[in-house]
């Protein structure tokens, strides 16, 4: 079992070494021979991979030959593309360094790679852009300007609403403070009046009025009606006449009229 395992381990290592040697040889060959050797290597790699791993799914880049006359029209890489690449690399670096604790060395290494790539991009020449996308630029610009105006209007309306809310809040705060001051003044006045009432009416701690007692003479004094009747010589005849007047129709009509008048006044 151990001999078979060693043999199975040696096979992929030998395959890797042979592929590396072939790649190094291709680097020294001209373009025509490189294309032919690349074709042979593809078929050979597929054959070896099917034998060793059983998988033959590879992604191969297609080489396109460009004449030197076409390369004369090439231009350096645009600045906006460089800026886009720089921003994209910075965001990728931040995403990589987010969950790493000791990230000083890694950050320095990634920044060096970014610097080298940007230096290569600065000297790189690319085919000129196709200007088909410029047809809709004016339309898109109008749409963006309209959206910007709408956003500015909404921001202005929101600012006005915020200013109104702030003003109402400040006025409410001032009114609340003035009401608190009035309440304090009124409570102090009520306390002073209570003290004065206690002093005037001699109210003790149990809130009982310390009024003087009534004299016995005031309790035994005659009623006012008795005093008036004592001045009249014929009291019984006067009382009978008063009863007759009270039961008469004119007096009843007058009393009914007075009651109706009071009812109307109350309503």
Swiss-Prot record:
Phosphorylation at Ser-49 is essential for CENPE recruitment to kinetochores and orderly chromosome congression. Residues 1-54 are annotated as: Disordered. One of its GO terms (cellular component) is actin cytoskeleton. The modification Phosphoserine is found at residue 49. One of its GO terms (biological process) is metaphase chromosome alignment. The keyword Cell cycle does not apply. It comes from the Eukaryota. Residues 1-22, 39-49 have a biased composition (Basic residues). The keyword Nucleus applies. Keywords: Centromere, Chromosome, Coiled coil, Nucleus, Phosphoprotein. It is found in: Nucleus; Chromosome, Centromere. Residues 100-202 form a coiled coil. Pfam families: CENP-Q. InterPro entries: CAD_CENP-Q. Component of the CENPA-CAD complex, composed of CENPI, CENPK, CENPL, CENPO, CENPP, CENPQ, CENPR and CENPS. The CENPA-CAD complex interacts with the CENPA-NAC complex, at least composed of CENPA, CENPC, CENPH, CENPM, CENPN, CENPT and CENPU. Component of the CENPA-CAD (nucleosome distal) complex, a complex recruited to centromeres which is involved in assembly of kinetochore proteins, mitotic progression and chromosome segregation. May be involved in incorporation of newly synthesized CENPA into centromeres via its interaction with the CENPA-NAC complex. Plays an important role in chromosome congression and in the recruitment of CENP-O complex (which comprises CENPO, CENPP, CENPQ and CENPU), CENPE and PLK1 to the kinetochores. PANTHER family: CENTROMERE PROTEIN Q (PTHR31345:SF3). Belongs to the CENP-Q/OKP1 family. This is Centromere protein Q. The gene is Cenpq.
């Amino acid at each position: 079992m151990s001999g078979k395992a060693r043999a199975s381990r040696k096979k992929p290592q030998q395959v890797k070494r042979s592929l590396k040697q072939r790649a190094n040889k291709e680097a020294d060959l001209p373009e025509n021979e490189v294309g032919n050797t690349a074709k042979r290597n593809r078929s050979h790699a597929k054959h070896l991979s099917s034998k060793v791993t059983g998988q033959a799914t590879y992604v191969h880049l297609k080489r396109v030959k460009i004449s030197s006359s076409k390369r004369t029209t090439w231009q350096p890489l645009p600045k906006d593309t460089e800026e886009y690449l720089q921003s994209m690399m910075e965001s990728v670096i931040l995403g990589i360094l987010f969950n790493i604790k000791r990230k000083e060395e890694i950050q320095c290494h990634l920044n060096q790679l970014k610097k080298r790539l940007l230096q290569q991009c600065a000297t790189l020449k690319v085919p000129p852009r196709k200007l088909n996308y410029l047809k809709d630029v004016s339309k898109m610009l109008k749409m963006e300007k309209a959206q910007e105006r709408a956003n500015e209007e909404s921001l202005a309306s929101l600012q006005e609403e915020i200013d109104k809310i702030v003003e109402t809040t400040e006025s409410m705060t001032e009114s609340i403070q003035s009401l608190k001051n009035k309440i304090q003044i009124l409570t102090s006045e009520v306390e002073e009046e209570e003290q004065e009432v206690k002093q005037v009416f001699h109210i003790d701690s149990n809130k009982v009025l310390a009024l003087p007692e009534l004299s016995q003479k005031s309790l035994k004094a005659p009623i006012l009606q008795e005093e008036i009747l004592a001045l009249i010589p014929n009291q019984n005849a006067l009382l009978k006449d008063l009863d007759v007047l009270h039961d008469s129709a004119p007096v009843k009509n007058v009393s009914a009229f007075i009651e109706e008048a009071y009812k109307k006044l109350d309503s």
